[in-house]
UniProtKB/Swiss-Prot annotation:
Annotated GO CC locations: cytoplasm; excinuclease repair complex
Organism: Staphylococcus epidermidis (strain ATCC 35984 / DSM 28319 / BCRC 17069 / CCUG 31568 / BM 3577 / RP62A)
Protein name: UvrABC system protein C
Cell compartment(s), UniProt: Cytoplasm
GO biological process, one term: nucleotide-excision repair
Record-linked Pfam families: GIY-YIG (PF01541), HHH_5 (PF14520), UVR (PF02151), UvrC_RNaseH (PF22920), UvrC_RNaseH_dom (PF08459)
Keyword Transport belongs to the record: no
Domain GIY-YIG: 17-94
Name of the gene encoding the protein in the UniProt record: uvrC
Domain UVR: 199-234
Membership in a protein family: Belongs to the UvrC family.
Lineage: Bacteria, Bacillati, Bacillota, Bacilli, Bacillales
Keyword Nucleotide-binding annotated: no
Length: 594
């Protein structure tokens, strides 16, 4: 039994049978999972006994220590769990800070308010309405309101009247004193309209349409008629879910094979305008997973808390109330209960449709890294960092690093490097510099170390990297090299001090993963190098010499590698590089005078 396993076993004996939260830590003392439990000892022991699904097995395999915090109640545990997840952002927790941002219409909280479409919700900065099903829907509604209510349009107050004032869509607060009561009245009418009360705005438009008709301004009357029709269309587009206009979110969920799907219906003005589905691998009871989910849904994500939240009857209303500060409803009959049933059914369908794909993808990527670890004789490389260099004969040399976690790209940990200490095209020294910079910073900042480092290259690259890691930084991390064939395709994985070929079948999941990693790091490095070249434009003394354009400049740099080497070249060597006599003389004179 490993030493850490003995310590964990001893520690489990003193964990109390009380509610609380626990923090699982890896070999780098990083928190990788936060959970809660009614009885801490039972929950923690369950991780280290019996069989688990693939995800929990991987989690347990990484645990080297744990901590726990006792709380006075299950509700307090939930609140603490949410705060700990925010603080540590563990990778095995379901963090709902994703890219599911929806558009809202906002009335700013300013002396002279503005009407905006935004995907960012900030507390105490104004009134928000939505979410809208898409940006087009929100923008069309805003355009309609802009034509009726002359709110300020400018971000900053200008010192003169703008076009919007002259077309009647602004009251010109930059120049004139505007009655603030007028703004208050407009804000109320817009609020009523966006909350489903459209009678006032329809009456205004009908009055304007009739007045325009009486004045024989039929073009203007038609415009008002179209606006009225647009409002009617807005209220008819979505399926009617309720006869009242209360702003509510309706939650349902389904559980199958260790996964939970939570379905949310956004109901506005009696219509279901949007729905959201989230897949969650279950680490706790289904009720506990739901409490964690709904707490994160409103605290970590940009979701407005509605006037009502509807949830299934089997859940503890008081626990949900502790993390969602609004009215919690658990319908037992009628149309509102039907909405809960519909959300549950949609969650079940979503789970059935996607579970097989998720399981297949999970199996494929996990199988790939497990196979890779077995073939190399190392522990399963959960975290892989790969490096590649890019330059044109030493010009604007750069390097890039990509990170794969659980066999998938982890793009927030990608890094770009400009080579600082190497002159000319020297791949080995460039790789040494970048690896030295990367892992010096990792050590200084306590960042997670990789389980495997891959370099795009052979034995020379590998030896240089291992020398830096072992002899300069004192690190023992497996280093492998990826080589390509004549067609520039991934062909071999090299490993060990003698850079031996690791036997991998070309059709294996492990080989496919390596191919993907090599392509990704190459793409990332090439893109960065291209961006760097575009910024510098290969600016040099060559730009000012008659007879040397972009093509000749690039050709010279490829031939000689640097301006310094060109300066050391003889006249004949410059001529042999393809320069006409006059141009070669111009270049030599320019470089000698430099």
């Amino acid at each position: 039994m490993e030493e850490y396993q003995k310590k964990i076993k001893e520690k489990l004996n003193v964990v109390p049978l009380e509610p609380g939260c626990y923090l699982m830590k890896d070999r780098n003392d990083q928190v990788i999972y936060v959970g809660k439990a009614k009885r801490l000892r039972n929950r923690l022991r369950s991780y280290f006994t019996g069989a688990h699904d693939a995800k929990t097995t991987r989690l347990v395999g990484e645990i080297r220590n744990f901590e726990f915090i006792v709380t006075s109640s299950e509700t307090e545990s939930l609140l603490l769990e949410l705060n700990l997840i925010k603080q540590y952002q563990p990778r095995y927790n379901i963090l709902l800070k994703d890219d599911k941002s929806y558009p809202f219409i906002k009335i700013t909280k300013e002396k002279h308010p503005r009407l905006l479409v935004t995907r960012t919700v900030k507390k105490n900065s104004g009134k928000y309405f939505g979410p809208y099903p898409n940006a087009y829907s929100a923008q069309e509604t805003k355009k309609l309101l802009d034509r009726i209510y002359p709110f300020r349009k400018c971000d900053n107050m200008p010192d003169k009247l703008c076009l919007y004032y002259h077309i009647g869509q602004c009251m010109g607060p930059c120049v004139y004193d505007v009655d603030l009561e007028k703004y208050a009245q407009m804000t109320k009418e817009i609020t009523d309209f966006l909350n489903g009360e459209d009678k006032t705005i329809l009456n205004h438009l009908e009055e304007r349409m009739n007045k325009a008709s009486e004045q024989l301004d039929f073009e203007q009357a038609k415009e008002y008629r179209d606006m009225i029709q647009h409002i009617h269309n807005l209220t008819k587009k979505q399926k009617i879910m309720s006869s009242d206009n209360t702003i509510r979110d309706v939650f349902g969920y389904s559980v199958s094979k260790g996964w939970m799907c939570v379905q949310v219906f956004f109901v506005r003005q009696g219509n279901m305008i949007k729905r959201d589905a989230t897949m969650i691998p279950i680490q706790q009871t289904e009720e506990e997973e739901f409490y964690t989910f709904i707490g994160q849904f409103y605290s970590l994500n940009q979701h407005l808390i509605p006037k009502e939240v509807h949830v299934p009857k089997n859940l503890d209303k008081d626990i949900i109330q502790s993390v969602v500060d609004t009215k919690i409803v658990q319908p037992v009959r009628g149309a509102k209960k039907d909405m809960i049933n519909l959300a549950n059914h949609n969650a079940e369908v979503q789970l059935d449709n996607k579970f097989e794909l998720i399981a297949r993808d999970e199996s494929r990527t996990i199988k790939a890294i497990e196979e890779l670890g077995e073939r190399m004789g190392i522990q399963t490389p959960i975290r892989i960092e790969a490096f590649d260099n890019s330059n044109i004969q030493g010009v604007d040399p750069v390097s890039a690093m990509v990170t794969f976690v659980d066999g998938k790209p982890h793009k927030k940990d990608y890094r770009k490097y400009k080579i600082k200490t190497v002159e000319g095209p020297d791949d080995y020294k460039s790789m040494r510099e970048v690896v030295r910079r990367r892992y010096t910073r990792v050590l200084n900042e306590g960042l997670p170390l990789p389980d495997l480092i891959i370099v795009d290259g052979g034995k020379g690259h590998m030896n240089g990297v291992m020398d830096v890691l072992e002899n300069e930084l004192g690190l023992d991390i497996p280093v492998a090299g990826l080589q390509k064939n004549d067609k520039h395709q991934t062909s071999e994985l090299l490993y060990g001090a003698s850079a031996e070929i690791v036997p991998l079948k070309k059709n294996s999941q492990a080989f496919y993963l390596l191919h993907r990693i090599q392509d990704e790091v190459h793409r990332f490095a090439i893109t960065f190098h291209r961006q760097t070249r575009q910024k510098t434009g290969l600016k040099s003394v060559l730009d000012d010499i008659d007879g040397i354009g972009t093509k000749r400049k690039t050709s010279l740099l490829r031939t000689f590698g640097s301006i310094k080497k060109m300066k050391e070249a003889s006249f004949d060597e410059l001529r042999q590089a393809g320069l006409p006599e006059k141009v070669a003389k111009n270049l030599q004179n320019a470089l000698q005078n430099k």
